[in-house]
Regions:
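Short, Lys/Arg-enriched N-terminal segments with co-localized hydrophobic residues
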Residues: 1-6
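Surface-exposed, charge/polar-rich loops and edge strands
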Residues: 7-48, 52-185
Length: 185
């Protein structure tokens, strides 16, 4: 794990903010909220709730609760948050399947982060098998690599179901390019 003194780098992924005018959280204000929690080297990426920060805390569950509490206090929103160490995220990318994250413009590559306590088996049993000719999935740790045809995405099994009320609240999704950028920050 990248450690500076006793500090470790983490990524917080907020679910469902700044989408179609709902759950508005300005990134500059979010950054200040993280800094008030005594997190250091706070950076945000895009407007979709990607925050990179350093903390001396080892327990991602504690970090998650702190961040969710700050968001509730500062923005009066109940936002699911997924916290992961940068080291773990690097390991995930190093273990990506060969078919995921290449430069094929016909394919859309995503990484699905599964919010604890949900597990891959919960997600899979809720959504079902992918349509093999249109999409691929592979689970690893607390994520699912998911790729699908850009032109036929509406025909995939996972596209509409990842946003369903039952399972959608247990997931947050980022593109391959976004995840790579976050790791490099």
């Amino acid at each position: 794990m990248e450690v500076v003194g006793d500090m470790r780098r983490y990524v917080a992924l907020l679910r469902g903010i700044n989408i179609s005018g709902k759950n508005k959280i300005p990134m500059a204000e979010l950054k200040k909220g993280f800094e008030k929690l005594a997190f250091e080297e706070v950076k945000t990426y895009l407007n979709s709730g990607n925050v990179i920060f350093s903390s001396g805390e080892d327990d991602t569950e504690k970090l998650t609760k702190q961040i969710q509490g700050m968001i509730k206090d500062q923005f009066d929103l109940d936002i699911p948050v997924f916290v992961i160490s940068r080291e773990t995220l690097e390991d995930i990318l190093q273990n990506a399947p060969d078919w995921w994250g290449n430069d094929n413009k016909e394919i859309y590559d995503n990484l699905i982060f599964i919010m604890p306590p949900a597990k891959f088996s919960d997600v899979y049993s809720e959504i079902g098998e992918p349509k093999k000719e249109l999409e691929k999935i592979e689970g690893y740790k607390d994520v699912i690599f998911w790729s699908f045809s850009r032109k036929d995405y509406q025909k995939t099994n996972w596209w509409s179901k990842t946003a369903s009320a039952n399972i959608g609240a247990k997931l947050t999704i980022r593109t391959a390019n976004t995840v790579r950028k976050i790791v490099s920050m």
